[in-house]
From Swiss-Prot:
PANTHER family: PHOSPHOMETHYLPYRIMIDINE SYNTHASE, CHLOROPLASTIC, THIAMINE BIOSYNTHESIS PROTEIN THIC. This is Phosphomethylpyrimidine synthase. The keyword NADP does not apply. The lineage of its organism: Bacteria, Pseudomonadati, Pseudomonadota, Gammaproteobacteria, Enterobacterales. InterPro entries: ThiC (IPR037509), ThiC-associated_dom (IPR025747), ThiC/Bza_core_dom (IPR038521), ThiC/BzaA/B (IPR002817). It comes from Salmonella gallinarum (strain 287/91 / NCTC 13346). It is an enzyme of class 4 (lyase). Homodimer. Its cofactor is [4Fe-4S] cluster. Catalyzes the synthesis of the hydroxymethylpyrimidine phosphate (HMP-P) moiety of thiamine from aminoimidazole ribotide (AIR) in a radical S-adenosyl-L-methionine (SAM)-dependent reaction. Belongs to the ThiC family. Zn(2+) binds at H437, H501. [4Fe-4S] cluster binds at C581, C584, C589.
Length: 631
């Protein structure tokens, strides 16, 4: 862990340098490949890890090798992972989905921004230096039209987004021929449907049933289509965002790019400080992954941080502002009802959700029902006009092990189920947020309750943390719970960084949180038995047994750390081909001994076979040619 502390000026300058010098970069010995769909502009990016051949024999001067297949893996890095693409953060990413959106002819450009706040910001010349220059003209649905992916799915339409996703979710496993790599243990799926091959029609079916969502605002055409659902591999979200006391636009864009490089499937911008609007524009125009927000945070800024002064009108204006910028999903704490707030009084840690506490305070101060609940149908109308998905927030999630699975938590969950049905009336896509802090033996009930109460809408959880005793290591405590709930059926895991409960994460914290959660998600996929989930593990194990060190580094989730740890003790190039590692040394390496045992067993089998043949030869009189009936 680095102990170097940079000043705010140094941090900002470093981030600016990162942005100014940014270019498409591949991981070591990997290359970007594209799999094309039924039309030329459906080009699905993947990363292909190139492997070295296996030495199978021959002489010192004439060695014989067997090729190892390249391993394709899911890639969230967008254009940032392609060395052939010219990156310019000032201009933003190419608008991948724009032709598909235009071809549907069910949306139209707006003459002016719908949000009064947006109009005010655009009229402020003092913000010119901060503002993203290539602003899009926002679109919304034409009158009487529904433009959500859920609407299309229910109409039986397979969109280009759905075909893109089907190709992406198969992760190129159809390219793998090796039986060794394709071997997979049967999983325990807890009722999930996991087809051997994911088709566009399967994607459509899952979206139509509400079991999966495709977060894809029509005003975020730069995003690469992805899906969140129980019957697909588990996804991971990364949180970024500035605060009133730290971080800049440059640093948040840097964290966005960094997050996608390390595997974030979606990113939530949780900014609460100055220039929220401008920061979000820069993030959206440069994001290849869906962006989520918690609109109540910005609405609170608009009333100077006084929760009691919040109004539906201010919140509605914020929804319009963010929807027209391109936010793909909103976290809405509409399930924090007035009658549930007293249930938290006997908790050890009360209400720990920022959004939940804001709404609870508003309800109590006005002694009125949550205005998000009261105006939920209007929220749905706004979301339907731009295809913004709803992430129904768990404002009453437990903030400590002692408060897990209590009355307040599950009362809110049941209300979220009721709201899900209302959102579906408007063809709005929905996922459900979950806890929190839950000990291991109480985790599965959360998944069971969610499936039953929320009609199998995708579950999206923060961990959960399985113990409260490890500040500084909560990416570990939560990674355990994340792997478990992912196995039970959770569709997306919100990462937790080492700074959880302590401070805002920096770049290295973001990476640590993402690697931890990619491990948890992959472990869950293995346990569920997702077809193809074991390919990379098998490739790694084969490389490990054959002492192909470079391949081991390159197959790792974090090749750089794997290489660095190896090189701490065996830095010489000869260490990259050694048939041992520094832990056991050359005489006690279990892999080396196993290879020797295998070679010895093979030799013994040949020797035994020859002895058996000799015995048979002598028993038959030692004749070279036998009569037919004796043969």
């Amino acid at each position: 862990m680095s102990t170097t502390t940079l000043t705010r000026r140094e941090q900002r300058a470093k981030a600016q340098h990162f942005i100014d010098t940014l270019e498409g970069t591949a991981f070591p010995n990997s290359k970007r490949i594209y799999v094309t769909g039924s039309q030329h502009d459906i080009r699905v990016p993947m990363r292909e890890i190139q492997l070295s051949p296996t030495l199978i024999g021959g002489s010192k001067d004439n060695q014989q090798f067997e090729e190892n297949e390249a391993v394709p893996v899911y890639d969230t890095s967008g254009p940032y992972g392609d060395p052939e693409v010219a990156i310019n953060v000032q201009q933003g990413l190419a608008k991948l989905r724009q032709p598909w959106i235009d071809a549907r002819n069910d949306s139209e450009e707006l003459d002016d921004r719908s949000s009064a706040y947006t109009r005010e910001r655009l009229a402020d010349d003092g913000l010119d230096d901060l503002r993203f220059t290539g602003l899009l003209t926002p679109k919304r649905a034409k009158a009487g039209k529904r433009i959500t992916q859920l609407h299309y799915a229910r109409q039986g339409i397979v969109t280009p987004e759905m075909e893109f996703i089907a190709i992406r979710e198969n992760m190129g496993r159809e390219r793998i021929c090796s039986e060794v790599l394709r071997h997979q243990h049967p999983g325990m799926s807890f009722g999930a449907r996991l087809p051997e091959n994911i088709t566009p029609e399967f994607v459509r079916d899952e979206v139509a049933a509400g079991r999966a969502i495709i977060p894809a605002n029509i005003n975020h055409p730069e995003s690469e289509p992805m899906i969140i659902g129980r019957n697909f591999p588990v996804k991971v979200n990364a949180n970024i965002g500035n605060s009133a006391v730290t971080s800049s636009i440059e640093e948040e864009v840097e964290k966005l790019v960094w997050s996608t490089r390390w595997g974030a499937d979606t990113v939530m911008d949780l900014s609460t400080g100055r220039y929220i609007h401008e920061t979000r524009e820069w993030i959206l125009r440069n994001s290849p992954v869906p962006i989520g927000t918690v609109p109540i945070y910005q609405a609170l800024e608009k009333v100077n941080g006084i929760a009691e002064d919040l109004t539906w009108e201010a919140f509605r204006d914020t929804l319009l502002e963010q929807a027209e910028q391109g936010v793909d999903y909103f976290t809405i704490h509409a399930g924090v009802l007035l009658r549930y707030v007293p249930m938290t009084a006997k908790r050890l840690t009360g209400i720990v959700s920022r959004g939940g506490s804001i709404m609870a305070k508003w309800c109590l101060s006005h002694h009125k029902e949550n205005f998000l609940f009261e105006h939920f149908r209007e929220i749905c109308e706004i979301c339907a006009a731009y295809d913004v998905s709803l992430s129904l927030g768990d404002g009453l999630r437990p903030g400590s092990i002692q408060d897990a699975n209590d009355e307040a938590q599950f009362s809110e969950l049941h209300t979220l189920g009721e709201l899900t049905k209302i959102a579906w009336e408007y063809d709005v896509q929905v996922m459900i947020e979950g806890p929190g802090h839950v000990p291991m033996h109480m985790i599965q009930r959360n998944m069971t309750e969610e499936l039953e109460s929320c009609h199998e809408a995708p579950f999206y959880t923060l961990g959960p943390l399985t113990t409260d005793i490890a500040p500084g290591y909560d990416h570990f405590t939560s990674g355990i719970g994340a792997a478990m709930i992912g196995w039970f059926g959770c569709a997306m895991l919100c990462y937790v960084t080492p700074k959880e409960h302590l401070g805002l994460p920096n770049k290295e914290d973001v990476k640590q949180g993402l690697i931890t959660y990619k491990i948890a998600a992959h472990a869950a996929d293995l346990a569920k038995g997702h077809p193809g989930a074991q390919i990379r593990d098998n490739a790694m194990s084969k490389a490990r047994f054959e002492f192909r060190w470079e391949d081991q580094f390159n197959l790792a989730l974090d090749p750089f750390t794997a290489r660095a740890y190896h090189d701490e003790t065996l830095p010489q190039e000869s260490g990259k081909v050694a048939h041992f590692c520094s832990m056991c040394g050359p005489k006690f390496c279990s892999m080396k001994i196993s290879q020797e045992v295998r070679d010895y067993a093979a030799a013994q089998a040949i020797e035994v076979g020859m002895a058996d043949m000799s015995e048979s030869f002598r028993a038959k009189g030692g004749e070279i040619y036998l009569k037919r009936e004796e043969a």
